[in-house]
Amino acid sequence: MTREELYQSIYTHETIYIPPQEEGSAALEVALGCSWHKCTFCDFARDEFFIHPLSRIEHNLQILGMLQPENTRLFLLGENAFCLSTEFLCQIIDLVAKYMPNVHRIAMYSRADDILRKTDEELRLLKSRGVAALHIGVESGSDPILAERCKGVTSAQILDALHRLEQTGIDYFVTIIPGLGGREYSHLHALETARLLNQLHPKNIWCLKLKLWEDTKLCKEAQKGFFQMMTPEEILLEERLMLENLHVKDCLFEDTTVLDQYTIYGMLPDQKKDLLRAIDYLLARP
Ligand code: SF4
């Protein structure tokens, strides 16, 4: 088999997605889809939720170890791979040590409630076994918006989960969805999200503006007039309000979807003024 064929043999889909912060990591598919699968805006979790048996994971790891023997970083694929039991994650990590002994940093996607279902002891164990970072879709700090979009967690639960990661020393990266509240809740979304983030210490805040994906519930609500989608300019103005009210420290802020064509990024708090200036400049264009 060629290298390409070997890679193809270990992934279900042709394209795999890992967060930009994990670029360069080897990617091991441990699950497909999302165990929650109910957020009304989500087009990400297309597969039915499925956890690969350990035998399949071991087989894939053997191949991945052959293809990337020197890689020190591993990303576990699955829309919320951290929902796997601690015991199962530890079994996977045992196999990682066998087939990819150079790996010392493991990251994956997680929901806030996946973290809450684990005890402090389990979180500490996973950290000691190499789980160094989780990527979490926070989306909004506003409870009415989280509830309306069926996120399945409250802002208090998000806060609790991420504080527990901080106590354990597991890093976390969060995504926010500007525009998720629609025109009606735009201010609330901006201010409540800033309020939530100000109580946290994420490594990175990644804004991905709302996109209405065909066939999602939210898209259908918008078509029926129950959700007012904002223009890209309105969404950027909302993001500006959130940024203005953000007081997080040592955190990279980025948005790769500005006006559907630009990327802005900068460290907070030092580059906050530059980021606001960049937004003002883009909003002032004809
Ligand atoms: S938790 Fe994430 S992956 Fe799962 S349905 Fe919601 S947005 Fe999609």
Predicted regions and their residues:
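Auxiliary Fe-S-binding modules of radical SAM enzymes
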Residues: M1-E22, N198-P286
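Canonical Radical SAM [4Fe-4S] cluster-binding loop centered on the CxxxCxxC motif
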Residues: H13-R56
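Hydrophobic faces of well-ordered beta-strands that scaffold small-molecule active sites
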Residues: A26-L28, T72-L74, H104-M108, L134-I136, ...
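Conserved, mostly hydrophobic/aromatic
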Residues: C34, C42, I57, L76, ...
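Aromatic/hydrophobic pocket-lining residues that form the small-molecule binding cavity
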Residues: I57, L89, T119, I158, ...
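Conserved SAM/AdoMet-binding glycine-rich loop
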Residues: M66-Q167, H247
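Conserved strand-turn element in the central/C-terminal portion of the radical SAM core barrel
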Residues: D113, G137, G141-I145, L165-H189, ...
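Catalytic cores of alpha/beta
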Residues: E121-E122, G181-Q199
